[in-house]
Amino acid sequence: MIVLLLGLASGFETAANDHLELKWMRDSEEFSALTTQVFLQAEQSVRTQARGRQRQPWTVVVDIDETLLDNTPYFLEMAAYDRPFDWPSWDAWCARGTAEPVPGAQAFVSAVRDAGGRVAFVSNRHERTRDVTVENLMAAGMWTAEDRMCLLTDDDSYTKRERRRQLRDGDGTCGWGEPVSVFAYAGDTMADLPEADEDGGRWEQLGVRTFVLPNPAYGKWEHGVTRPGLIVTDGVD
């Protein structure tokens, strides 16, 4: 058994070294500083907006994975076994409930509650993982019964945009039953933020109400150029 565990540990270490983006997220002081900085900026914005608004309902909308919870152990395990992401293994990882908070996340969530706000978790974890996700967030000090969790379903129309709309308007399965103001949106991908024609847009509100955390492990950029205005010249100067 000891030999087996040593072998697995060696495999995970090799996977981390082969996937420098995961090692950077897990081990670098810079990653911790960047995520903490983003959350501190978001907290300052929320507290400024909350002054004099305590009796009016408001919330922050946050993603879960690689925003509040660190899932790099899952990706290291998959890399060690040379396996791609798949839903069964991901659901099994969620069921463990062992993901730790991203640096700065727990303090931000606590600050929101201290300022009189509520937290809305809008995530593409599937609805079938709701209970284990709540348990993980609770263990990490980031869940209360006053929160809302809006997860992915098999209904293609239940997009993150629609979930955010329900939260703001107070209707549907995601809303609190009353309209609320959203003081901040935070996530590790642009899809976690309002679209151009939605609630002030994402770029226009960047650093004011919309906040992006670094995630070099995965995203739409893996499959094509996503940077606005970037011209691809096929190597021709």
Residues covered by each model-derived region:
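Metal-dependent phosphoesterase signature
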Residues: 69, 75-101
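C-terminal cap/substrate-recognition subdomain and adjoining C-terminal extension
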Residues: 29, 126, 130-237
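Non-catalytic pre-domain segments flanking phosphatase-related domains
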Residues: 2-62, 226-237
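Solvent-exposed, polar/charged alpha-helical surfaces in well-ordered, non-transmembrane soluble domains
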Residues: 40, 44, 103-110, 131, ...
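Structural motif
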Residues: 59, 118, 182-184
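Short, acidic loop-to-helix structural element flanking the phosphoryl-transfer center
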Residues: 91-120, 127-128
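Sec-exported extracytoplasmic/periplasmic mature domains
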Residues: 47, 51, 74, 110-118, ...
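Active-site-adjacent structural elements in enzyme catalytic domains
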Residues: 53-78
